[in-house]
């Protein structure tokens, strides 16, 4: 974790602009993720002629690389400072575009081209974990740890915005100039972000002996488990709401996803100070309650409007879960370990989203589509009980190094 600046007397627009000036680098990294997302599966399957397995693997490699590299990103951010980690991550995004470019240029050699695509995806996954973790910690170092919840919230907003913007733009660029043109756009986005990041003032890395990974994990795993359980609701909506609407014979699945995204982003914008005012655990419990109601409404929906209200509530409920629990998790460790704590905490969400799809698919094939939303509501209820227990337990002693944050 970077050494914090003196807690700045910032509020409102000025504070948000300071935060956005840093998290825009995470926006750039996620834009390089979103741009090829809707293009690569079809390119691998239809143009290169590989099976659906390989098309899926090309996409999944990025997520596996992100998952495996995220703890290292946190540790390096603690020891080297977050700015260096962000620049490193953006360089990975640039190299991923270079991988796509060379894959397009070697299209006459399908196996070589596929290997270059896979290499680009792995590098992108590593770059995303470094840029995402680093930008959060850099933002906290700039505006002060009092505003850590707001920094995490803004990081989520720019992530959603970049993914939503990137996918359709990527299709446009691909139809305009093929994979090579798309690759050049990705490289250009990353290069501009790197050039903007390099002149920015550096936030000093923390000085102090870091805790072993096992000790960090021991302090944050309960918060991570609550996050993982709550993420199941997001996972089943994002993955299976289209199948749910098809099974019911309804139209409007895409609009339901739009409602979820609007509720997610809108809640973060409407309640930027909620975590500071009533505490992270209290916010998390309120969010879990709203998410449970939403998932139950989807599961028992007999008309489209019920499902849409349920999806809206689920999006609003899930919106502040990550920052609310994240604020408490990172403050459970000394300052010099808070980067590692944030990265370790985030891994639980990565794992949850990775296993929710296959497990929900098995349940769905056995008991029907609506059941997965009822099951997800049950998991979020467990997260609510776990958070209630965390609130009731005596506060743990955190070493003095963490007291300033």
UniProtKB/Swiss-Prot annotation:
Topological domain spans for side Cytoplasmic: 1-18, 68-84, 128-155, 199-223, 273-282, 330-343, 387-405
Predominant location: membrane
Effect of gene knockout: Deletion increases intracellular arabinose concentrations as compared to the wild type.
Induction (free text): Induced by arabinose.
GO MF entries: transmembrane transporter activity
One Pfam assignment: MFS_1
A GO CC term assigned to this protein in UniProt: plasma membrane
Periplasmic side: 40-46, 106, 177, 245-251, 304-308, 365
Recorded superkingdom: Bacteria
Topological category with respect to the lipid bilayer: Multi-pass membrane protein
Transmembrane region(s): 19-39, 47-67, 85-105, 107-127, 156-176, 178-198, 224-244, 252-272, 283-303, 309-329, 344-364, 366-386
The UniProt record lists the keyword Membrane: yes
Keywords noted in UniProt: Cell inner membrane, Cell membrane, Membrane, Transmembrane, Transmembrane helix, Transport
Location in or out of the cell: Cell inner membrane
PROSITE patterns linked: MFS
Record function comment: Confers high-level resistance to glyphosate when overexpressed. Overexpression has no effect on intracellular arabinose concentrations.
Similarity comment: family membership: Belongs to the major facilitator superfamily. YhhS family.
Protein name: Uncharacterized MFS-type transporter YhhS
Source species of the chain: Escherichia coli (strain K12)
Protein encoded by which gene: yhhS
